[in-house]
Every structure is written in structure tokens, then in C-alpha cells.
A protein has these predicted regions:
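Residue-level marker of intrinsically disordered, low-complexity segments enriched
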Residues: 3-6, 29, 289
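Intrinsically disordered, low-complexity boundary segments flanking structured domains
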Residues: 20-25, 100-107, 181-184, 203-209
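Intrinsic-disorder/low-complexity coil detector
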Residues: 21, 52, 58, 257-260, ...
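Near-N-terminal "mature-domain entry" segment
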Residues: 30-161, 165, 176, 253, ...
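Internal, well-folded beta-alpha domain core
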Residues: 125-297
């Protein structure tokens, strides 16, 4: 359990290069739902058709989305300085406020193109093969302070509004989204495994409960280093994000559909990851997985 691990192990690399997936993984029919955080920075919307709110996935979130959109645009249109304070923007990011004022008319792009940063660079959606891209469209759900949650093929404009924001009239968005999410997310999860890779602010917006929690696995990435002959482990943001992105990519490329957290551990180990698992101590709790890394290439 102390061996070094890179994003893709030798066994995994051989499997993917040969285009084979273990038969036990291919037989599964249930969809794994992967919960991701958004990126703080985002790609420009570019030109194109504007947002069509009615076209977004999870229509049960439509009313809540409209309310957040209204409050955000109103704030940014009427009081730029207050908007900068509420959104937690530095002076150099003041231009993000102008983007928010144009959310209803700005060009919209697939969310998978909008979100950038370490996790999404490692995930590499644009370089997945066609089959893996279809899997990603079904499996990935990106949480958002503005939209609640979207699929990667949902077309959205670039925006600035994190889950930690407190909007006038709505309050803290993490708390605001809990009710709508509690209604919409269990249906999206279906009866399959939920792989929760969200950061704490976004995890606060929805926590699986009951039987659904028992088939949910959260992942923590630990960086292991030898210090004076003793192994020390810590959470390092870059390693955490990059490893999660590559882990999702490997699962998509392998076509793995583990039926539950225990089988997920087996799949990840087969893909070359060093995984330590802790089953929940009581009913209605999620599994906690630690992925231990020493370096990222």
C-alpha cells in the first residue's frame, strides 16, 4: 500500500492501449454517476446561440436556476462594487462582473468546454475517443453555484459565481441549493454507484442519504513523501485535482461500471492506483477512499 503510483499504472496502460476492458466491468448495465466540482476560472463563451434554460439537464432545478440567474444578473448590473465584494473578486477580475451582466445574451458552449483548470486538463474531455465521450456525457455531473448541476453537454455561458457566494435575496448558495438538489439528484443517481469528487463547498449543496449514501464513494487524494525516513501524507491541491481528473479519464477509457464502492476499489487497483478504503461504520453513510500518490506526470 506504500508503492508509488502515477495517474495510470502499467496494467491499466496496457489494457487501454490494447483496447480491452475486463469482462466483469463491461457486463455492468448501471451508470456510474460522477460528481465533479466546477473550475473557478472558465473559458470564454465565444459567439453562438445564447443560453436556453429549458434545454439544461435536471429540469427539476429550473426554477432555482432562474432565481439565482435573476439575482446574479441584477446584482452585477446595479452595483458593480457590491458585486465584486459579494463574488469575492480581486480588482484584476472586475471584468468577470461584466460577463455576468450578459449571461442571458452571451454565447453558450458545452459545459465540458467552459470548465478549465487542473482537474479538467487532466480529464482531457476533448481527447477522449468517441465511445468514452458518450460515457462522459452520461456519467459526469458538474456542480455549480449558478446552475446547481449540469451535464458536460449542457450549453452554458461563461460565468462567475461560486457555491460559497451569498447572493442578496437568496443567501448562501450552498444552503439554497440543498432543497432543489434533494429532489433532483436521487433520480439522476438511479440505482448505480455515485463517485463523489466534489470539493467541500460543492459537497455542502447535496449529501446522499440512506441507501444512496451506501453506494456512494468519496475520494481523497494523499501525497506521500518520505521525510527523515518516515512517510508523511498530506493533501496537496494540485495533486488532488490532477489525480481526480486522470482517475475519471481512466474509468471512462476503460468502460468500467463498478456496481458499488467495494467493486470500485478493485477497479481502481486494477487500473494501477494505490487505494485504501474505509467502509462506513453504520448504515446510511458513504464509503471513504484514499488514493495515495507520490508523483504526477
Amino acid at each position: 500500500m506504500r508503492a508509488a503510483v502515477v495517474a495510470v499504472g502499467a496494467r491499466a496502460l496496457g489494457t487501454l492501449q490494447r483496447g480491452r476492458t475486463p469482462a466483469s466491468y463491461r457486463k455492468r448495465s448501471s451508470i456510474v454517476l460522477v460528481l465533479l466540482p466546477p473550475s473557478e476560472g472558465k473559458a470564454d463563451s465565444g459567439r453562438g446561440a445564447p443560453l436556453k434554460p429549458e434545454s439544461l439537464s435536471l429540469p427539476g432545478l429550473a426554477e432555482a436556476r432562474a432565481a439565482v440567474l435573476d439575482e446574479l444578473v441584477e446584482l452585477c448590473v446595479t452595483d458593480e462594487e457590491k458585486a465584486r465584494e459579494v463574488l469575492g473578486l480581486s480588482e484584476g477580475l472586475r471584468g468577470e462582473i461584466a460577463k455576468n451582466t450578459e449571461l442571458r445574451v452571451a454565447g453558450a458552449r458545452p459545459a465540458g468546454d467552459i470548465y478549465t483548470g487542473v482537474l479538467y486538463d487532466a480529464l482531457g474531455l476533448a481527447t477522449l475517443d468517441a465511445v468514452a465521450k458518450r460515457r462522459a456525457t452520461k456519467a459526469l455531473l458538474v456542480f455549480s453555484g449558478l446552475w446547481g448541476a449540469v451535464r458536460i453537454n449542457d450549453r452554458i455561458p461563461s460565468y462567475r459565481c461560486s457555491m460559497g457566494v451569498k447572493l442578496p435575496g437568496l443567501g448562501a448558495l450552498g444552503a439554497y441549493w440543498r432543497g432543489p438538489m434533494a429532489e433532483a439528484l436521487p433520480e439522476a443517481a438511479g440505482d448505480g454507484l455515485v463517485l463523489d469528487l466534489r470539493s467541500s463547498a460543492y459537497a455542502n449543496a447535496w449529501k446522499p442519504k440512506g441507501e444512496l449514501a451506501e453506494r456512494t464513494a468519496t475520494v481523497r487524494v494523499l501525497h506521500a513523501q518520505m521525510v527523515n525516513g518516515v512517510e508523511k501524507r498530506s493533501v496537496v491541491s494540485h495533486f488532488n485535482k490532477a489525480t481526480k481528473g486522470r482517475l475519471v479519464r481512466d474509468l471512462l477509457m476503460a468502460g468500467a461500471k463498478p456496481a458499488g464502492p467495494g467493486e470500485l476499489v478493485t477497479v481502481l487497483r486494477d487500473l494501477g492506483y494505490v487505494v485504501e478504503a474505509e467502509a462506513p461504520g453504520r448504515a446510511g453513510r458513504a464509503w471513504a477512499l484514499d488514493v495515495v500518490v507520490t508523483e504526477i506526470h
